[in-house]
Amino acid sequence: SVVDGWTTFR
């Protein structure tokens, strides 16, 4: 999901 990708980006 998009949120999952953002967590890794953060």
Curated annotation (Swiss-Prot):
Pathway: Glycan metabolism; pectin degradation; 2-dehydro-3-deoxy-D-gluconate from pectin: step 1/5. Its main location: secreted. It is found in: Secreted, Cell wall. It is an enzyme of class 3 (hydrolase). Keywords: Aspartyl esterase, Cell wall, Cell wall biogenesis/degradation, Hydrolase, Secreted. This is Pectinesterase. GO terms for biological process: cell wall organization; pectin catabolic process. Belongs to the pectinesterase family. GO terms for cellular component: extracellular region. GO terms for molecular function: pectinesterase activity. Its EC number is 3.1.1.11. Substrate binds at T8. It catalyses: [(1->4)-alpha-D-galacturonosyl methyl ester](n) + n H2O = [(1->4)-alpha-D-galacturonosyl](n) + n methanol + n H(+).
